[in-house]
A protein has these predicted regions:
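Bacterial N-terminal signal peptides that target proteins for export
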Residues: 1-10
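Bacterial N-terminal signal peptides
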Residues: 9-19
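Sec/Tat signal peptide C-region and signal peptidase I cleavage site
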Residues: 21-25
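Ser/Thr/Asn(+Pro)-rich, low-complexity disordered segments
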Residues: 26-227, 231, 243, 256-265, ...
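Short glycine/serine- and small hydrophobic-enriched flexible loop segments
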Residues: 162-169, 237-242, 291-299
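Carbohydrate-binding/catalytic loop surfaces
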Residues: 206-219, 275-278, 282-292, 329-357
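Internal, well-ordered domain-core segments that constitute the primary functional module
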Residues: 255-320
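Extended amphipathic alpha-helical segments with heptad-repeat/coiled-coil character used for oligomerization
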Residues: 294, 303, 307-370
């Protein structure tokens, strides 16, 4: 029982000591510099057993109902096959097997194909169970079904690529041979998911190895998202390291897979240093990319695989660490959730590596993380814990999603001791449901609290409404919404998402008449095209004071001033007896909602550290004396004067997605947004093929020399 587990941790310790110095070249970026190994081990203690103790769910196993008793039971039958009731012995036909159920059998009568992507989730607790109890014959049998071996879609492949190096030898030579045969022929012309979704046909079948001339081996149309491609390509490289030289991976010889894989990941890293990545700071999908890279780091068994996987891991974690406050992400995200920072994979990873609060203790640990020898360096630790001079500003030039257009969007971030505020100037509606346009995170004694909002197209703190534009300078942000117009030339663009999503007019919607569940759910359903701007304020954030058309929030860590564009605003809260098990309105379980009405609606938020004032009264007096907001509804212009006497001027652009902005009278240009090229800040600069770090006098740079990262 202990054999696989003991060998795993021995293997990890050997690799940690053997390779870290060779890979990093500089102590500042070495995994050995990670400053909290004891704390990390304490935090992950018992997590493998916890993962193993979770119920084993065979989501691919269909159900049937006894025609005599009406009692349901599980089967392994295909639709139309004869089955027998275990209660009465009656023979009858298996009905539909569900999305994940078995669909085909091979010539030996074994299930050769399942629907869906069940092993995205099911394989992880099974792996944990087998690491602790190798002789579980039921689980070993389940993982020997040919249809399960064939599940090499990206999420499942990423899980198999951790299972195989850890447990393949324990499964035996015959199992390994069958697994290698499944991998050798894997190709899919459909796109199974972990939910009941169907997609259009693919232009090119998916496989593990990919298309050699495309970014990470996937074409822009339907070759997979950034995290999909990282999971597939990393899995192929791991398989290539552990399969015989004569084996095939999706039809490709092992030797060619190794060469192609190195090319994919080296090219991706070089692009990161020139443009940044397209799926930036994704709270949803970064964990899956990270897990694929951890597989490479731990198991690809070549110096080049460890070098490139570590370099990319370091980049992803460093560039997200400075935006993290107590494990919650502030600022913009690409492919982020509509309800940010509610706990999940990324927060769990932060908790284990950095000791930040666990926002959802019931969420399972990442098997990949807790069985990996990779550790973030002290530099990344310092970025995460803000162990450098504060406050700080960061400008980021974001590329298009496929990294083929630099500076496609412009992000700004302001970080202080207890809060982070960030936003992005967007030029395209691209997967707007998963675009976080702006957010504010505040550290509190009760954990991090996240604010967000916009015109209620998505009715959530996140999402990109085509009617919303922002402007930010340091600790001040203006959020505005109005009707838009689509210029004539844009109407000729095929598939123009702005034309499709922003052509409907905005309409007045009266406030809900009660705080009851039915009324609020109905109101939320009608609010998508409301002529208003919403602000989601976490419950328990602090005491709220409403003074002279300003809303002040008193918190022990920070003070906020919210200035609505007009006096026509109101609060929406759920009643004490309301319960929202599903739907958009469930957000009111954790938030109260400020609604600002108007054809040109919005608000300005200014936030300061509470210890920068002797008392809240002093802050209030300073707001009354210095803070000013001027709004011209006709011209859609806003000018805000801050406590620091900086002026932030926004001019809403009805025919665009990005406002015109002036700061202290100077026009803000977007063409050369980030002087370094990608990231520009004191602790972190990226661009023109170089990553530069500077924390407390420890200065280093990384660039690619002789086809590998060079640390200076």
């Amino acid at each position: 029982m202990e054999k696989a587990l003991n060998s795993l941790f021995l293997y990890s310790l050997i690799l940690l000591g053997l390779f870290s110095g060779q890979v990093t070249g500089q102590a500042i970026f070495s995994t050995d510099s990670y400053p909290d190994e004891k704390g990390y081990q304490d935090r992950i203690s018992g997590e493998l057993k916890g993962l193993a103790s979770s119920p084993t769910l065979f989501r691919s196993q269909p159900s049937a109902r006894c025609p005599d008793t009406g009692i349901k039971f599980k089967t392994w039958a295909l639709e139309g096959e004869i089955i027998f009731s275990p209660f009465t012995g009656r023979a009858f036909l298996q009905g539909p097997t569900g999305y994940f159920g078995p669909k085909k059998r091979d010539e030996n009568g074994e299930i050769s194909y399942f629907g869906g992507d069940a092993l995205k989730k099911d394989l992880l607790p099974i792996t944990a169970k087998l690491l602790l109890q190798l002789n579980d014959s039921l689980l070993r049998g389940f993982l020997s079904i040919p249809g399960n071996l064939q599940q090499q879609y990206h999420f499942a492949a990423k899980n198999w690529a951790r299972f195989y190096p850890l447990l393949a030898d324990e499964m035996g030579p015959a199992w390994k041979s069958e697994f290698q045969k499944a991998v050798a022929t894997y190709s899919a012309s459909n796109r199974p998911s972990d939910g009941y979704r169907k997609y259009d046909p693919l232009s090119t079948p998916h496989n593990l190895v990919g298309e050699p001339d495309e970014l990470l081996g996937g074409n822009k149309k339907d070759g997979g998202t950034e995290n999909h491609k990282i999971m597939w390509r990393s899995s192929a490289w791991v398989y290539a390291a552990h399969f015989p030289d004569t084996a095939l991976i999706s039809g490709w010889p092992v030797s060619e897979v190794k060469t192609l894989s190195e090319r994919y990941f080296s090219d991706f890293y070089e692009r990161l240093l020139k443009t940044g990545n397209g799926e930036y700071d994704s709270e949803i999908y970064y964990p899956h990319s990270i897990e694929g890279l951890l597989n490479l780091y731990d198991f690809a068994e070549s110096e080049s695989a460890r070098v490139w996987s570590k370099a990319i891991l370091d980049y992803l974690l460093a560039t997200i660490a400075f935006k993290s406050y107590d494990g919650a992400l502030a600022g913009a995200q690409k492919r982020g959730p509509s309800l940010m920072n509610s706990g999940g994979e990324l927060n769990k990873m932060f908790h284990f590596w950095f000791g930040s609060p666990d926002l959802d203790p019931d969420h399972p640990a990442s098997l990949h993380q807790i069985t990996s020898s990779y550790r973030p360096s002290k530099y990344i630790w310092d970025l995460f814990h803000k162990s450098f001079p504060l406050p700080f500003e960061v400008k980021v030039s974001r590329p298009s999603y496929h990294m083929d257009q630099a500076n496609h969007a412009q992000e700004y971030f302001y970080g202080s001791k207890n809060f982070g505020l960030g936003s992005i100037y967007l030029t395209q509606l691209d997967n707007p449901n998963q675009q976080v346009q702006w957010s504010l995170v505040i550290k509190t004694a009760k954990g991090p609290k996240t604010l967000g909002g916009s015109q209620p197209f998505h009715r959530s703190p996140g999402g990109h409404s085509p009617y919303t534009q922002t402007a930010q300078h340091k600790n001040v942000i203006v959020v505005a919404a109005a009707a838009t117009e689509v210029p004539g030339e844009e109407t000729k663009m095929s598939g123009n998402p702005r034309l499709n999503l922003a052509q409907k007019p905005l309409n007045f919607l009266a406030a809900p008449t009660s705080t009851g569940q039915i009324e609020l759910e109905k109101w939320f359903a009608e609010a998508k095209q409301q002529e208003a701007t919403w602000l989601f304020i976490p419950k328990g954030l602090g005491k709220i004071h409403e003074i002279k058309n300003k809303i002040l929030i008193e918190n022990s860590e920070a003070y906020l001033c919210i200035s609505p564009f007009s006096s026509d605003h109101y609060w929406v809260e759920a009643g004490a007896d309301s319960n929202f098990p599903k739907g958009k309105a469930k957000v009111l379980a954790d938030y109260k909602l400020l609604v600002v009405n108007g054809s040109f609606s919005g608000y300005c938020i200014e936030i300061v550290e509470s210890d920068s004032y002797a008392s809240f009264s002093e802050f209030k007096d300073s707001i009354n004396a210095n803070s000013r907001l001027e709004v011209d509804i006709i011209t859609r212009k806003v000018t805000h004067t801050s406590l620091a006497l900086d002026t932030l001027h926004m001019e809403y652009q009805s025919t665009a997605l990005r406002a015109k902005v002036k700061i202290n009278g100077a026009v803000i240009g977007f063409d050369k947004w980030s002087p370094s090229g990608v990231y520009t800040s004191v602790p972190l600069k990226v661009g023109e093929g170089v990553f530069k770090g500077d924390v407390n006098g420890e200065i280093f740079s990384i660039r690619v020399n002789n086809n590998k990262p060079s640390y200076d």
